[in-house]
Amino acid sequence: PALAVTIGTLALYRGLALVVIGDQSISDFPKWATSAVTGSFGSTGIPYMAIPVILFVVLFWLLLHKTPYGRGLFALGYSKQAAEFVGIDTKRSRVIALTLSGLMAALAGIYWTLRYSAAKADNVEGLELVVIAAVVFGGVSVFGGRGSIWGSVCGVLTIGVLNYALRLNRIPEVILVLV
């Protein structure tokens, strides 16, 4: 149900964005902000954004695999009744997990907007399903209780590299949608 509610909420906010800005594109962003997400460290080619991404991956890996909260979250995903039976506050755990998920989605939205210097109501439309497919490919169960940060990262990187390779080979967009 959480996934369905999340996608429904996405549709609600996307509709709200259409009402507020219509089909316009907002692109007046400070140069420092766009440079922060598009720049790289000297001639290394390593993007500035690699640092926060690596930090978030490590932080969430530690949270999920090395804390009682994380182990409880896996238990909750596996069986809500069993998690409650062993004393896990399932409502609190869900609220924290969904809040962190929303925060990360907001940061990703800000990144995407600054990366392409355009805020539009239909930015990245359809990307949510690609991301879900990538993390499922990485071993995460949409029903909960199974998965890992590293598996998710591998799934996202695999889908990203595949998509990039197909675009480099000039595969038509109509075919890319099928892949």
PLM feature spans:
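Alpha-helical transmembrane segments of multipass membrane proteins
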Residues: 15-16, 57-59, 106, 110-111, ...
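Hydrophobic/aromatic residues within transmembrane alpha-helices
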Residues: 12, 82-83, 136, 158
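Transmembrane helix-bundle core of multi-pass membrane transporters
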Residues: 3-67, 72, 93-95, 115-124, ...
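Transmembrane alpha-helical segments in multi-pass inner-membrane proteins
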Residues: 99, 105, 116-178
